[in-house]
Amino acid sequence: MFPTHVLLIVIACVTAFVYGGGGKRPRVCRYSSDGPVCRTNIECSDPEVHCYRKPGHPYGRCCVKRPYACPRGSSNRYDDPEGFPPLVQRCPYAYPFFCRPGYYCRTKTGGSTEFYGVCCPLRVG
């Protein structure tokens, strides 16, 4: 038979796995990675980022707003803008080389009517 302390450790680990989701926390943000913990938009310190809280939760996460998300193909998946988390790297749309190599300046509408955008990663293929 197992020693008692080994059995207790196994029971504790199995219980933590079952009730804790196996150590994997579900994502809060839909259009970016989860940013820092927050309660209000002010705590996120970025106009392109807001505090998203699931209903009934006292805390949320700083998330990139959908208009500033970086789409990844047509599968409704998104990449993080440069600098996020915690902050988004903004860029003047009129200057296409403002973002570092491997990134492009994307406005919230995806067109030239917006002056500022965010630096999104280029995806080839």
From Swiss-Prot:
Q: Which domain of life is it from?
A: Eukaryota
Which keywords has UniProt assigned to this entry? Glycoprotein, Secreted, Signal
Instruction: State where the protein is found.
Output: Secreted
Q: Name which cysteines form disulfide bonds.
A: none
What GO terms fall under cellular component here? extracellular region
Q: Keyword check for Secreted, yes or no.
A: yes
The entry's note on the tissues where this protein occurs is: Expressed at highest levels in mantle, followed by adductor muscle. Found in the nacreous shell layer (at protein level).
Where in the sequence is the signal peptide annotated? 1-16
Record carries keyword Protein biosynthesis: no
Its PTM note reads:
Weakly glycosylated.
The protein's name in its UniProt record: Upsalin
Q: From what organism does this protein derive?
A: Unio pictorum
